[in-house]
């Protein structure tokens, strides 16, 4: 199996612009290359920027620990377990078609021309050499390819999967955007008739918030503190608390 990991974080534009380390956060999924510990899996990891060689070597050596040998981590790993195409992601030599138990790092050739707030999947779509390279790695052998997105799939991941003629592991973007929020999760739990804590969801303006909060406080006088959370508080920043004892009247 060939796993193409495009760990794009599909936050809204405002949320992305407010995250100065957004590009680095997209690269935090690098540990996915360790899925290549399975000899039947070859991992193609798409990185938003060029990775330092010592970082790539670190993961290569982690994978090499499962090899037969002296067990010394300093021992050079066997070539069959590493991605020799990592330093030259667009070269199409026979060495780039790697067996299972290995990984290849691919960097979109136009990544440095996009702002740091650009989602990785969109950068891939605008990088023709990267798309060509991913298609080559996905279909050069008999292994079954699959595209694995980041936190959730969006229109860019869907379009990329169509270009690569590769299945997308994840829900349809329309379904994902509908149920990946807190309100969406609440709707699913209510439909399944599962007991959940008291609360309100699908609140879209101040008037709805005040009415829902007044009903909750009046109906649960034993609750002394209520927590507010936005539907998608990326980075846990969209949270607040209300202490009922500070209210004079409800």
Language model features: what each stretch is:
Residues 1-180, 184:
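ATP-binding N-terminal substructure of ATP-dependent carboxylate-amine bond-forming enzymes
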Residues 172-250:
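Active-site nucleotide/adenylate-binding loops and adjacent lid/helix of ATP-dependent enzymes
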């Amino acid at each position: 199996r060939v796993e193409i990991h495009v760990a794009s974080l599909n936050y809204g534009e405002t949320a992305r612009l407010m995250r100065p380390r957004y590009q680095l956060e997209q690269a935090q999924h690098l540990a996915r290359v360790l899925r290549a510990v399975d000899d039947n899996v070859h991992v193609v990891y798409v990185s938003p920027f060029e990775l330092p060689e010592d970082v790539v070597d670190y993961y290569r050596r982690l994978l090499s620990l499962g090899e037969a040998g002296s067990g010394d981590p300093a021992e050079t790993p066997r070539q069959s377990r590493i991605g020799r195409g990592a330093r030259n992601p667009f070269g199409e030599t026979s060495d780039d078609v790697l067996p299972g138990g290995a990984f290849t790092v691919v960097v979109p050739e136009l990544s440095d021309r996009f702002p740091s707030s650009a989602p990785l999947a969109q950068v891939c779509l605008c990088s023709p050499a990267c798309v060509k390279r991913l298609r080559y790695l996905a279909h050069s052998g008999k292994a079954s390819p699959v595209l694995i997105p980041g936190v959730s799939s969006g229109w860019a991941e869907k379009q990329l999967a169509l270009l690569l003629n590769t299945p997308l592991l994840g829900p349809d973007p329309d379904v994902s955007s509908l149920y990946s929020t807190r309100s969406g999760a609440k709707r699913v739990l209510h439909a399944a008739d599962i007991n959940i804590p008291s609360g309100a969801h699908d609140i879209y303006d101040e008037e709805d918030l005040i009415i829902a909060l007044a009903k909750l406080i009046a109906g649960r006088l034993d609750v002394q503190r209520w927590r507010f959370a936005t539907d998608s508080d990326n980075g846990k920043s969209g949270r607040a608390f209300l202490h009922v004892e500070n209210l004079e009247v409800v």
